[in-house]
Each structure stands twice: as structure tokens, then as C-alpha cells.
Amino acid sequence: MTEQNLLSSLAHMISEQRNPNSMNLDSLSPLELVTLINNEDKQVPLAIEKVLPQIAQAVEKIVRTFQQGGRLVYIGAGTSGRLGVLDASECPPTYGVKPEMVVGLIAGGERALRHPIEGAEDNAEQGKADLQQINFSKKDILVGIAASGRTPYVIGALNYAKSLGAITISIASNPDSAMASIADIAIDTLVGAEVLTGSSRMKSGTAQKLVLNMLTTASMVLMGKCYQNLMVDVQASNEKLRARAIRIVMQATDCEKEVAERFLKAADNNAKLAIMMVLTNLDKQQASVLLQRHQGKLSRALSQ
């Protein structure tokens, strides 16, 4: 794209407009600044509320993908890419899933998580190449993230995924974007102009984070990764999470700390299995078989 064409494109993007509420930004006091930012941030959940049906549709597709052995892959550049990597990295400790179940890719690779990589987002072919590097297939589902909706790296990845027959989802902060025209499901979080003109790490980034939270949380809940509202598949990999696992067993079964610790030890620190054992008086093997029979969904297993 020529510089003139890019300037014309940016001029029409909501995320690149000047916000009339912040025209005097450089003359505000600290309290006035943070009050303004906070007031603008209040628009984010309202914008997301308008696309909840599309988010729910995406969750249904993600769950079906997981059930069929596929992966959820996020791809983006800059803030968008970092948020995808962040959400993906939280899934193993929270839900006890393998790291490859939810994958985050960022333009420029690992170094781009901490440092800007010049020109990385402009390479559409690299988006395709990065998917090929992880053996992306039509069994997987791709979520392309970019506030602008036009990032070449993400568009290249979406086009490649589409060519394979994979389901594609876009998350953007501008309407009628190039990404939305490619994706099977377009999630357009129209949060309006940023307080600092063009700084899409702000409201647009906040909207992306909230949507990603919804996608993985709702999908994992539907996959049986929680009981009531407890993260029963938590991996007790550090002191805080070990304490949380004990509390989860206590909360789910109304047992004492010593009982929770004893059953967790018998269940190899598997909180879900420990809860099953406490509530049913089954041994580890019997409880495990019953859980497997119900696809790991504790509520269903307990109802038998």
C-alpha cells in the first residue's frame, strides 16, 4: 500500500480519529487526566454488549473445535499479539490443558513481546508462514486480532486459514474492515476514538482483552473445566495455586482443610478428582472412570 493510500485508509478509521472529549489532554491535571481516561473506558463494555451474539457464536465454534481435537490459535501484531499470547499462556495453569490447546502468535516472534519489531506487522506472507510453522490445519480455529482491522500480517494468516477450510474469527475496532470481510465471524468492538489519538493499546486493547477473556473462559466452562464457579482443573504448580486447590476442594465439598489435603494427595493434586472422591466415597480409579464417562464434567458425573 502506498503512503497516500495508507493515509487515506487511516483517515476513515474510527480508531484513528481525534476524540473531541480529549482535545485539551495536554492541559489537564493528574486527576482530570485519569478521570477522563476512566470515563472513556466505561464505553468499552457497552461496545462489547452489542456484539455478544457474535462472541457467543465464536465460543460455540471454539468448543466444537476443542471437542474434535483442534486448537484455538490467536494471531496479531503489537498490543493485539501480546494480548493473544497472554490469554493463551493463562490457559494451562487455570484449566489444566496442554499448552498447545490455545496458542498465541505475534508478528516478529518472541522478541516482539517486549520490543517493537520494525515492519513485522506489514508482512502478510509471514502471517501465513507462522501458521505453517505450527502446522495449522482445517481442524484448528483462528482468531485474528487487530484494532485497525487491516494489519497485513493478520490478513495473510486469515486468508491462509480460510484457504484450508478452517473457521476464522476477527476482532477489530473499526466497522467493515478487511479482516471482517474474510472472517466467518466478525467481532467489531466499536469503542470509538482513543483518548490519545491512535493509541489503540487503550480502549481497543481493553476491548480485545475482555473479548479474549470471554472466548477462553466460556469455552473452557463448556468443556467441563469448572464446577459451579470453581476452577477445578487448576494446576497446583506454585504455593498460591496449591493453596487455591485446597480451598477449592473445601469450598466444593464443605470439608475441613485436613480432609481436602488428604484427598488431594490421594488424587495426585487433581482438585476435580479429589472433589469427586470426597462427595461420592469412590476411590481414585472409580472416580476417574466416572469422570471420563462424562467427558470430565464434574456436575454431570455427580448427578449419576
From Swiss-Prot:
This is N-acetylmuramic acid 6-phosphate etherase. The gene is murQ. It catalyses: N-acetyl-D-muramate 6-phosphate + H2O = N-acetyl-D-glucosamine 6-phosphate + (R)-lactate. SUPFAM superfamilies: SIS domain (SSF53697). PROSITE patterns: GCKR, SIS. It comes from Mannheimia succiniciproducens (strain KCTC 0769BP / MBEL55E). HAMAP family: MurQ. One of its GO terms (biological process) is 1,6-anhydro-N-acetyl-beta-muramic acid catabolic process. Belongs to the GCKR-like family. MurNAc-6-P etherase subfamily.
